């Protein structure tokens, strides 16, 4: 169970500025619906002063994504665009009191979304250090520049740290070698700088790529589960979530499990609720954490599928 601050809980249970802003003239989208972390930021900017008059968010993600989005909209309202762009993911986490390290990627995505919205308002392409940055993580469409920026901003030093802060690399692990390469390149100048500052001391040693490649093995591998075991774990997660939904006169029912697709049916007050996408996103995130794999939660309005064990 993650250790959430009271402010994170406040912004999750009572999110500020949820929904799209009417008359928005800046829109920033990041993430992927298929991966359960789609985020949209809408801003209403005064064209005379570039001051953000209003901000709203829509998210298909976990509780930390909702809280980070809520916090970001509160932070940017009343700021001009240049000042808003100075907000870092660490500022968002600080505003919330703290975020678990495993959830820092939610604040990183908030910053990405703000950058995208400002670029959209200004009619610009998002500028990077390279004209055609190399794609590091194909599962989440994240490029090398964003990985480098996150490493620098948060002083990261391991592959595990990068996956916790960006949620990239936590799926198929195919991008770990690329992350290792970027880490070794980013850490090398720091070591050389320390060495040059005091030439009388022994040169600082940097982890070689072969040493860095040992880090992915620290990530706990989840044993392959049988279909019955997966269904039981899924039902356990839904049973833990159900009391919260029932307090609001809603409920959730497992309909079917087909590989990485998990079909559920929202009932009662949850049917047609404006927060239904957030509820599904929270369920999906809990299932990902429990199963140790990326799954997709798909809502069904009726139960034409019969669960097969």
Swiss-Prot record:
InterPro entries: BFD-like_2Fe2S-bd_dom, BFD-like_2Fe2S-bd_dom_sf, FSCA_dom_sf, N_fixation_NifU, NIF_FeS_clus_asmbl_NifU, NIF_FeS_clus_asmbl_NifU_C, NIF_FeS_clus_asmbl_NifU_N. One of its GO terms (molecular function) is 2 iron, 2 sulfur cluster binding. One of its GO terms (biological process) is iron-sulfur cluster assembly. Its cofactor is [2Fe-2S] cluster. Disulfide bonds: none annotated. It comes from the Bacteria. Binds 1 [2Fe-2S] cluster per subunit. CDD domains: IscU_like, NifU_Fer2_BFD-like. NCBIfam families: NifU_proper. The second ligand for the 2Fe-2S cluster is Ser-139 but should probably be Cys. This is Nitrogen fixation protein NifU. The lineage of its organism: Bacteria, Pseudomonadati, Pseudomonadota, Gammaproteobacteria, Pseudomonadales. The gene is nifU.
């Amino acid at each position: 169970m993650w250790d959430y601050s009271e402010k994170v809980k406040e912004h999750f249970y009572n999110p500020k500025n949820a929904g799209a802003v009417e008359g928005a003239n800046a829109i920033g989208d990041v993430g992927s619906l298929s991966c359960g972390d789609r985020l949209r930021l809408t801003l209403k900017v005064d064209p005379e002063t570039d001051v953000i008059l209003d901000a709203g968010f829509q998210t298909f993600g976990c509780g930390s994504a909702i809280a980070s989005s809520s916090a970001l909209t509160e932070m940017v309202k009343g700021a001009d665009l240049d000042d808003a762009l100075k907000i870092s993911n660490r500022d968002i986490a600080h505003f919330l009191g703290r975020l678990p390290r495993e959830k820092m990627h939610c604040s990183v995505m908030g910053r990405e979304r703000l950058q995208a919205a400002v670029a959209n308002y200004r009619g610009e392409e998002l500028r990077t250090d390279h004209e055609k940055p190399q794609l590091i993580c194909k599962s989440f469409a994240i490029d090398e520049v964003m990985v480098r920026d996150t490493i620098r901003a948060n002083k990261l030093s391991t592959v595990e740290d990068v996956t916790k802060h960006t949620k990239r690399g936590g799926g198929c692990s195919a991008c770990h070698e690329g992350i290792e390469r970027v880490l070794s390149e980013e850490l090398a100048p720091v070591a050389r700088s320390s060495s040059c500052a005091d030439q009388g001391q022994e040169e600082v040693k940097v982890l070689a790529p072969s040493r860095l490649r040992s880090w992915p093995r620290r990530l706990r591998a989840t044993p392959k589960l049988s279909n019955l075991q997966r269904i039981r774990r899924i039902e356990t997660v839904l049973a833990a979530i159900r009391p919260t939904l029932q307090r609001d006169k809603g409920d959730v029912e497992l309909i079917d499990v087909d590989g990485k697709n998990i079909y559920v049916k929202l009932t009662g007050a949850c049917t047609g609720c404006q927060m239904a996408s957030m509820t599904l996103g929270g369920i999906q995130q809990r299932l990902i954490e429990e199963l140790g794999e990326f799954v997709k939660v798909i809502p069904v309005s009726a139960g034409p599928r019969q669960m097969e064990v």
